[in-house]
Amino acid sequence: MERREFCASLLAGGTAGMCVDLILFPLDTIKTRLQSPLGFSKSGGFRGIYAGVPSTAVGSFPNAAAFFVTYESAKQLLRSDSSYLSPIIHMAAASLGEVVACLIRVPSEVIKQRAQVSPSSTTYQMLSATLRQEGIKGLYRGYKSTVLREIPFSLVQFPLWESLKDLWSWKQGRAVDSWQSAVCGAFAGGFAAALTTPLDVAKTRIMLAKAGSGVASGNVLFALHEIWRTQGIMGLFAGVIPRMTAISLGGFIFLGAYDKVRTLMLREQ
């Protein structure tokens, strides 16, 4: 990847990610509380819906930037002239991007979610308590479950986003505009969000579980089984509506803003 493309992906991805995470933070808080083992009301209800936002503010830019730099680099590295291979290349690039981005995302997500279900505690208090009780390892609790959520999500979202853009571009005989890319992103994100909600619930339960419990071990299948055993299908899809809403809106803003900022930067350089 050329330096100008690297810088464009870095800044466009980071800017888009930070905008989305901060704008849609209240919906994310509601979703997390619906998925909490304590239940919505005991986790704070509609009170303190910006609890944990400092963690997101710190982690959003580097997380999104890391994803898109890896995604664009992998796409170029795996580039093929065959149109049939394009979806596979997009899937592989997105998966690699998620593995890298989760190294930054997971510590931020752990602290954010614990603050969201304990609105009386500050982000700093949550960080201190996690480090004191579990050490650095505690910040990465749920890394595997997050990757196992993000990879299937990206395997659906990004190839679908790219395919919808290609189809729209072919229909109108020119490249899609930023707003059209955003519409494609909203549809792709919402669809992927619905399909992967059970994995998101499992990830939330693992991150919020008491240290030493079976769920806290990080075994996704065990977490899914426990949710199914105690709450059934409703438990597996807890928070699906706010998750779909947030990610659809997020896809519209995130992928539209990413395309717009990246195009502008490459045009100016």
Curated annotation (Swiss-Prot):
Protein family (similarity comment): Belongs to the mitochondrial carrier (TC 2.A.29) family.
Solcar repeat placement: 4-77, 85-167, 176-264
UniProt source species: Xenopus tropicalis (Western clawed frog)
Transmembrane segments: 5-25, 49-69, 84-104, 141-161, 181-201, 237-257
Keyword set, alphabetical order: Antiport, Membrane, Mitochondrion, Mitochondrion inner membrane, Repeat, S-adenosyl-L-methionine, Transmembrane, Transmembrane helix, Transport
Membrane topology: Multi-pass membrane protein
Reaction catalysed by this enzyme: S-adenosyl-L-homocysteine(out) + S-adenosyl-L-methionine(in) = S-adenosyl-L-homocysteine(in) + S-adenosyl-L-methionine(out)
InterPro entries in alphabetical order: Mit_carrier (IPR002067), Mitochondrial_sb/sol_carrier (IPR018108), Mt_carrier_dom_sf (IPR023395)
Protein name: Mitochondrial S-adenosylmethionine carrier protein
Pfam family of the protein (one): Mito_carr
Function: Mitochondrial S-adenosyl-L-methionine/S-adenosyl-L-homocysteine antiporter. Mediates the exchange of cytosolic S-adenosyl-L-methionine, the predominant methyl-group donor for macromolecule methylation processes, for mitochondrial S-adenosylhomocysteine(SAH), a by-product of methylation reactions.
Subcellular location: Mitochondrion inner membrane
Gene: slc25a26
Assigned GO CC terms: mitochondrial inner membrane
GO process annotations (BP): mitochondrial S-adenosyl-L-methionine transmembrane transport; S-adenosyl-L-methionine transport
An MF annotation (GO) of this entry: S-adenosyl-L-methionine transmembrane transporter activity
